Amino acid sequence: MGALDTAVRSGRALYAGISNYGGAQTREAARILKALGTPCLIHQPRYNMLDRAPETGGVLDAIGEAGMGCIPFSPLAQGLLTERYLGGIPDGSRATQGKWLDPKAIDAPLRARLTALGAIAKARGQTLAQMALAWVLRDPRITSALIGASRPEQIEDCVRAANAPKFAAAELAAIDKALAA
């Protein structure tokens, strides 16, 4: 935290932020930086429908308590929360590269959960990607979400999530049920 404070004070950075810290670590980082006079303004955790660790591990609570912004990365779970993998692993996809996405993880049970999520998205008038982004952004502690795209139309699709209708309680319950299957 001292290095972050030094970077801000010396003009090398405009603000301090952290990434991938757990709940307790987030609270401690915020406390230390505040004591140094350099508030921690942003946290960047991995967060999506398939990886809810920031909820269960207290990260979102710590962010809210500290008044930090939150910009999650991988809100589409490296493309899993799109329709791309519903029929299997397409040629040229991340899963074929085996670097960041394990093809063995894209099994029939996962595809069934993704298909169920896709049906919920369709009922909302959205693509699965749009719903997944809207789901991440539903929490007021989330400032924005980092997306990646390999084609312009993917960005256009993701941007539409900004105008998504709010989730009804029944929709959130259906999402939780689909994910638990």
PLM segments and residue spans:
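Beta/alpha (TIM)-barrel catalytic core signal, keyed to glycine-rich beta->alpha loops juxtaposed to Asp/Glu
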Residues: 1-180
